[in-house]
Regions:
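Cell wall/extracellular polymer interaction/catalysis modules
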Residues: 1-151, 155-162
Length: 162
C-alpha cells in the first residue's frame, strides 16, 4: 500500500520557508508545520541554505549519528558505499544527501532538512516553530514502513499566503 504525506509550502521569507504538512488517512487536517531553508530557483543550490526542490520523494528510516536515534529520511536513490547506505536526492541538476525530518526552531537548525513542529510564528524577520512533532510523526510514518508499505513525501510550492 502507498501513503502520501502532503507538504504545502505557503509562506516565504528571504532565509526560510514555512509549510503545512498533512498526513494520509485516517489523520484529518493539518498535522503540523515544516520549517526549511529558502526555496531557490530551479537548479540553484547554496549548500546548507537551500530547501529541496518541490516534487515527490521516497521516505525511509535511517540511524542518525548526530541525533543518536532513528529518523525519517527523504531520498530519490540510495547509494551503497563501504557497507553504508547514502540517501540522496537528485533533482533539477542538484543533489542533497541525508535530508532528515527532525525537530528544531529556526532555519539555522535545518541545513536542508525538514523541521517539524506543532506551532509556528510568522511575525518577525524569520519564521520560528515550536513544539516538536518529530516523535509523533516518526511513530506514524515508521509504522507504515515497518509494515512494508511505501511512503511518498510530496512537496508543493504554493503562492505566498498572507
Amino acid at each position: 500500500m502507498e501513503h502520501t504525506v502532503e507538504h504545502k509550502r505557503k509562506w516565504y521569507k528571504p532565509q526560510s520557508t514555512l509549510s503545512e504538512v498533512f498526513l494520509p488517512v485516517p489523520y484529518n487536517g493539518r498535522f503540523g508545520y515544516i520549517l526549511e531553508d529558502t526555496v531557490r530557483a530551479k537548479g540553484i543550490k547554496v549548500a546548507k541554505f537551500t530547501a529541496i526542490p518541490e516534487g515527490k520523494y521516497n521516505v525511509g528510516i535511517r540511524y542518525s549519528n548526530s541525533f543518536k536515534r532513528n529518523v525519517l529520511v527523504l531520498y530519490t536513490k540510495i547509494i551503497e558505499k563501504n557497507g553504508y547506505k547514502e540517501y540522496v536526492i537528485e533533482k533539477d541538476g542538484i543533489s542533497f544527501t541525508y535530508v532528515l525530518v527532525h525537530g528544531g526552531n529556526t532555519h539555522h537548525h535545518s541545513d536542508a532538512c525538514l523541521l517539524i513542529a506543532k506551532n509556528a510564528n510568522t511575525s518577525g524577520e524569520d519564521f520560528v516553530i515550536q513544539g516538536t512533532m518529530e516523535n509523533e510523526l516518526f511513530h506514524i510514518i515508521s509504522s507504515y514502513i515497518k509494515n512494508g508499505d511505501t511512503v511518498i513525501w510530496k512537496i508543493t510550492n504554493e503562492p505566498q499566503k498572507e
